[in-house]
Structure formats: C-alpha cells, structure tokens
Amino acid sequence: MKKEIGGYFELEDFGGKEYYPNLYKVNLGRTALRWLLEGRGYTKIYLPVFLCESVTEACEQRGIRISRYQLDAELNVLLPRKKLGESECLYLVNYYGQLTDEKILAYQKIFGNIIVDHTHAFFQKPLPGVDTLYSCRKFLGVSDGAYLSTDAELEPEKKPLDHSMGRKIGRAHV
C-alpha cells in the first residue's frame, strides 16, 4: 500500500497494466455516460433520486429526458415492472455492492435497457450484454479515468470532451 499524503493516496504507477484492458477508456464516468447515451440513441433515462449531480448534468447536456425513481430501504428499484421503450433506459447504481450479477440480470430481464454504474463497485466485473460504467478515481490513486463496457457501436470521433479541471475552478460547461 502506498504512503498516505494528507488523507489522500499518492498517484499510483501500474506499470502500463490496465485493470480492464478490453473496455473503452475515457477520462471520466460522465464522459462514458454521455458517449453511451449518444451511441445507444436514448432519449429518456430513469435515474434514482439518490444520485450524484454529475450524472444528472451529463444527461441534461445530451438533451435526455429524465424521470426519477424511488428506492426502498434495501436500495431496490421502485418502478412498475415492465419493459421500457426502445429509446429509454434504467440507470442502476451499485451503491454498496448490493447489485449482485443475478440481480443485475433480473433488472435487465424486467426493464430491458439498463446502464449499471459500478463507480462504487470497481472490482465487480461487467456482464456480457450489460452496459456498465466504472470510475477509477474512487478506488485507485489516479487523477481521472473511467471505463465503459458496452456492445453498442460507438464512434470514437464523436466522443464527448469533458474538462475535468472544471471541478477545481468551478463548473466547466462543454
């Protein structure tokens, strides 16, 4: 383990090895989300009420309609159990590792289009056919970085930019 510096870990050197070498690599989780929303052509997303503002902002920047859903005491989705429309998706956050692979697959079977946010479950591997986002900063001593697992056809030249220094000097708007 690295030596702590003022409550933070120093930046890590991984010797050029990626934890998820076969996934898309982007600078931030919200960048991965915007890229995925564009690639899938979603026009509406169901977001939990307990959520980081940056996710909401990323959806708004893409012009995605947002509908909020409640969670029960065990962080289960409280929505009518039905397939979503082709251009709609459900955003699932794995807050404390409560989303097992079985539960994720059950949500996919019920709702169809889902996006799993493993920001707080970095080491839980992505499932085939399930769009999954990871943010490296929550678990690793890196300044930025995120992974995206998807089988969607994504166009690299359309990758949205995200100016992460906006966190330091106020919000940067893309």
What are these model-derived regions, one by one?
Residues A172-V174:
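Conserved small/polar residues in nucleotide/adenosyl-binding loops
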Residues E86, P128-G129:
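Alpha-helix C-terminal capping/helix-to-coil transition sites in glycosyltransferase folds
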Residues I5-Y19, L23, N27, T31-K109, ...:
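PLP-dependent aminotransferase-like
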Residues V116-H118, C136:
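A cross-domain feature marking catalytic cores of carbohydrate-active enzymes
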Residues G129-K168:
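Active-site PLP attachment segment
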